[in-house]
Amino acid sequence: MSHLLDSVDAASLRSDVPAFRPGDTVNVHVRVIEGNRSRVQQFKGVVIRRQGAGVRETFTVRKVSFSVGVERTFPVHTPIVEKIELVTRGDVRRAKLYYLRELRGKAAKIKEKRDS
């Protein structure tokens, strides 16, 4: 039974997802449907967590908009997400960056990872 579920899950996995980790800054293009119209909205922020595996994998992006922190959780393999752009790589030592919620201003900035 699990082999059948794995094959169904593999059919709905996306192949165009970049390799990103918590601490990275990403630009998520989300399809928003308003009435009978649809448009693409961008949500740019820092990935604070990545959770799950396979079809159920999700990631949470945090940004500060007009001095209010906004977090949004997206499924990785959903068709609502048009594309995920990796803007910068962050240098962090944790897998879950919940401590960023308490920080303000420059303290909430993440160092950029240097290519070596």
Curated annotation (Swiss-Prot):
Pfam families for the chain: Ribosomal_L19
GO biological process: translation
Top-level taxon of origin: Bacteria
Keywords: Ribonucleoprotein, Ribosomal protein
GO molecular function, one term: structural constituent of ribosome
PROSITE patterns: RIBOSOMAL_L19
Gene3D superfamilies, alphabetized: 2.30.30.790
A single cellular component GO annotation: cytosolic large ribosomal subunit
InterPro entries registered for this protein in UniProt: Ribosomal_bL19, Ribosomal_bL19_CS, Ribosomal_bL19_sf, Translation_prot_SH3-like_sf
Family of the protein in this entry: Belongs to the bacterial ribosomal protein bL19 family.
Protein task: This protein is located at the 30S-50S ribosomal subunit interface and may play a role in the structure and function of the aminoacyl-tRNA binding site.
Protein name according to UniProt: Large ribosomal subunit protein bL19
Organism: Streptomyces coelicolor (strain ATCC BAA-471 / A3(2) / M145)
Lineage: Bacteria, Bacillati, Actinomycetota, Actinomycetes, Kitasatosporales
Gene for this chain: rplS
